[in-house]
From Swiss-Prot:
Signal peptide: none annotated. It is found in: Membrane. This is Putative transmembrane protein FLJ36131. The keyword Transmembrane applies. Residues 24-124 are extracellular. Residues 1-2 are cytoplasmic. It comes from Homo sapiens (Human). Keywords: Glycoprotein, Membrane, Signal-anchor, Transmembrane, Transmembrane helix.
Length: 124
């Protein structure tokens, strides 16, 4: 019984991750991301903490110029990339932004090189 419940919870988590990745990749264009909004409306915070009790998801997409952005965010906050209204975000929700830039020689193979920056924002 315990194994089947664990399996169903794991499966539902996988389905939610896939759905979220689909939304980010195919529904939200890169141009909809408003970093100005994020920088001014969300206070800078620490990396996601397990003490918050949030389920963290990761999603990412590639820009046409070779840049890639990857996001991690808490499920309760409904913090999708873009410029979501603050009223839709619960206090304590954090977004972790990781920026990568591909090497010149790796652009055609879509391989990423070094990690450039890691920034974390939390809703106050």
């Amino acid at each position: 019984m315990y194994v089947s419940i664990s399996f169903l919870l794991g499966l539902s988590h996988l389905v939610l991750c896939c759905l979220l990745t689909f939304i980010v990749n195919f529904y939200l264009p890169p141009e909809s991301i408003d970093f100005e909004f994020m920088a001014h409306n969300w206070s800078k915070g620490r990396s996601p903490s397990s003490t918050l009790g949030l389920s963290w998801f990761k999603a990412g997409f590639r820009f046409s110029d070779g840049w890639s952005m990857f996001y991690s965010f808490g499920l309760p906050g409904v913090a999708l990339p873009g410029s979501p209204p603050r009223s839709h975000l619960l206090p304590g929700t954090q977004i972790l932004i990781r920026s990568f830039q591909p090497c010149e020689s790796a652009k055609h193979s879509a391989r990423l090189s070094s990690l450039l920056t890691t920034t974390s924002y939390s809703v106050s």
